[in-house]
Curated annotation (Swiss-Prot):
Gene name of this polypeptide: rplV
Assembly and interaction partners: Part of the 50S ribosomal subunit.
Any GO molecular function: structural constituent of ribosome
Record InterPro entries: Ribosomal_uL22, Ribosomal_uL22_bac/chlpt-type, Ribosomal_uL22_bac/org-type, Ribosomal_uL22_CS, Ribosomal_uL22_sf
Keywords: Ribonucleoprotein, Ribosomal protein, RNA-binding, rRNA-binding
Biological role stated in the UniProt entry: This protein binds specifically to 23S rRNA; its binding is stimulated by other ribosomal proteins, e.g. L4, L17, and L20. It is important during the early stages of 50S assembly. It makes multiple contacts with different domains of the 23S rRNA in the assembled 50S subunit and ribosome.
Family designation: Belongs to the universal ribosomal protein uL22 family.
Transmembrane region(s): none
The keyword rRNA-binding is annotated on this UniProt entry: yes
The name this protein goes by in its record: Large ribosomal subunit protein uL22
Gene3D superfamilies: Ribosomal protein L22/L17 (3.90.470.10)
HAMAP family the record matches: Ribosomal_uL22_B
Any one GO BP annotation for this protein: translation
PROSITE patterns, alphabetized: RIBOSOMAL_L22
Organism: Ehrlichia canis (strain Jake)
Amino acid sequence: MGKVLVEAKGIGLRSTPSKLNLVADLIRGKDVSVAMMYLKFCKKKSAGYISKVLKSAVANAQANYNVDLDNLYVKEVLVGKSFSLRRVHARARGKACRVHKHYGNVIIKLFERI
């Protein structure tokens, strides 16, 4: 087991945590190159958000620690709830109701294989 090399965060992503978690399940425990390929061919909107965070983590690892890309793997992908925007939606007979637009957070931790 390697040590924690790098952590990248995506805060306030315009997708719900449950939708982000569907895509995050695809890349947990995979090598970085395999995870990037999975995200490239995934058609979900959340895959684009997670792909950006993963690329940021890889860039941080290469810039700060001079790590080879082939030795990196995705150890953890943490998905959490961020803020919710509340909007008003007009309804029948002069009434109104609230619409909640949920946002999510993603934290990706990369480890190095020994």
